[in-house]
């Protein structure tokens, strides 16, 4: 089936989902509503990128999503670049923004194990998304999982959770060079084909005035936070914590978030990148990190811990990498967090199936290199994707170890709540498959400003000044995307 490169135009899938209409009713006042049948079309991809397809089909829509992996992928992670997904506006009534206490009630209703979903046999099973929901879980989702103190506020307008069912979507199979288009209206197939045939018009980048850049935490304040965290480590409360600082960039003219995303993907291509155009603002993320993936009954997480700046040349780059690989502080932090993820997966996976199938791998990006591992296991038969997300969220690499105590300390030390930063976004497929990143290397575009957040892992022998510099290094690619337009 994967070799087909023509339009079938047939009905190939239908199922049942709860009808969710915003707000405070995760179960759905309207009961079950049959999922409209999908009309599928398969076309040659012809080397086009996710960004190009998104621009052609959905770039004009007020609500739209792109989940993009660059292809060919980096030699450091060749298996992470096969698919991209882009989608337009939601089906009528199929957008939901819950309160934190409602999030998992909704996700349990969404989970296919609660519904008689009629899956198509005419579309390749390997495609990651056969229809379902796209969305995010902000950092505050942790408060729906654990009892945590409320002492800080989030002044950004984005809802804690946001999920919607798209009216039309496209899967790009970069490896097979095929484009799979799905729509609820068969007449839309010809319309989209016409759009895809049109030449892509390049958009000239405007001259952006100098950025007015401010940090909500200055160096002295951040180093004080680091020292306070080290006191908690010394007292035995925690072993490691991730502390962040927020920056805000303002200009006299509105920045084009889509141009920023494209520029950021050019200078810092990342396997879990995403672009969200939403009613509350735009989200630009070039995340290198996966929180969780579930495919069938195989669950996996891919923690990143350990960072070095890129060298000015190959020799310096290699020297910095070797320093990273023998640095006892970095290695201890990484292994500690891998163990945390093993334990989290072990809560919902079958005994004896959790394994580290990739340990201390190097992944290189435009401004930094990372140490990365991969942990996987077989989900227990009586567990669902909802249980898996609850076990892993938020990622241990952006909180610390032990996770709950670190969440409490972060709430105490950081001046503002994290909003979407360090939450997750991605897809939840109607078959039960899901793939969520961690929202790092992310910019939030709201009226009049762009906000970013970066941080570093703190351990007992951390140097506060070096942790400050590591955080700034992580911000460089984001700031370069803003300043380089």
From Swiss-Prot:
One of its GO terms (molecular function) is metal ion binding. Signal peptide: none annotated. Pathway: Amino-acid biosynthesis; L-tryptophan biosynthesis; L-tryptophan from chorismate: step 1/5. Pfam families: Anth_synt_I_N, Chorismate_bind. Tetramer of two components I and two components II. Belongs to the anthranilate synthase component I family. This is Anthranilate synthase component I-like protein. It comes from Synechocystis sp. (strain ATCC 27184 / PCC 6803 / Kazusa). The gene is trpE2.
């Amino acid at each position: 089936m994967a070799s087909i490169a023509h339009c079938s135009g047939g009905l190939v899938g239908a199922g049942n989902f709860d009808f969710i209409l915003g707000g405070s009713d995760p179960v759905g006042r309207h009961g079950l509503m049959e999922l409209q049948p999908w009309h599928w079309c398969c076309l040659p991809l012809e080397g086009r990128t996710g960004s190009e397809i998104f621009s052609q089909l959905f770039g004009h829509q007020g609500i739209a999503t792109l989940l993009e992996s660059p292809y060919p992928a980096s030699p450091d992670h060749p298996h992470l670049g096969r698919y991209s997904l882009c989608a337009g506006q939601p089906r009528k009534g199929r957008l939901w923004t819950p309160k934190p206490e409602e999030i998992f009630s909704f996700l349990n209703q969404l989970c296919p194990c609660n519904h008689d979903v009629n899956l198509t046999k005419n579309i390749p099973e390997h495609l990651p998304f056969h229809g379902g929901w796209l969305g995010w879980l902000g950092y505050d989702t942790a408060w729906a999982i654990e009892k945590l103190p409320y002492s800080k506020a989030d002044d950004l307008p984005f809802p804690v959770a946001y999920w919607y069912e798209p009216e039309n979507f496209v899967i790009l199979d970069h490896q097979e060079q095929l484009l799979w288009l799905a729509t609820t209206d068969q007449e839309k197939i010809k319309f989209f084909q016409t759009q895809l045939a049109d030449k892509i018009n390049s958009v000239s980048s405007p001259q952006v005035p100098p950025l007015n850049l401010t940090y909500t935490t200055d160096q002295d304040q951040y180093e004080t936070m680091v020292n306070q965290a080290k006191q908690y480590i010394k007292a035995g409360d925690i072993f490691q914590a991730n502390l962040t600082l927020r920056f805000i960039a303002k200009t006299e003219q509105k920045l084009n978030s889509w141009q920023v995303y494209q520029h950021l993907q050019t200078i810092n291509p990342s396997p879990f990148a995403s672009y969200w155009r939403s009613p509350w603002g735009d989200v630009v993320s070039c995340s290198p990190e996966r929180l969780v993936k579930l495919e069938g009954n195989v669950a996996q997480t891919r923690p990143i811990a350990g960072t070095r700046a890129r060298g000015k040349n190959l020799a310096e780059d290699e020297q910095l990498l070797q320093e990273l690989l023998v640095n006892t502080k970095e290695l201890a932090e990484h292994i500690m967090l891998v163990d945390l993820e093993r334990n989290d997966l072990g809560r919902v996976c079958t005994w004896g199936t959790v394994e580290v199938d990739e340990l201390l791998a190097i992944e290189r990006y435009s401004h930094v290199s990372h140490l990365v591992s991969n942990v996987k296991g077989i989900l227990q038969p009586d567990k669902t994707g909802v249980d898996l997300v609850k076990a892993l969220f938020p990622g241990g690499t952006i909180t610390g170890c032990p996770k709950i105590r670190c969440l409490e300390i972060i709430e105490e030390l950081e001046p503002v709540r994290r909003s979407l930063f360090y939450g997750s976004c991605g897809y939840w497929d109607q078959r039960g498959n899901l793939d969520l990143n961690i929202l790092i290397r992310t910019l939030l575009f709201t009226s009049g400003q762009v906000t970013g957040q970066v941080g570093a892992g703190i351990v007992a022998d951390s140097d506060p000044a070096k942790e400050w510099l590591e955080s700034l290094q992580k911000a460089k690619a984001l700031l370069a995307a803003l300043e380089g337009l």
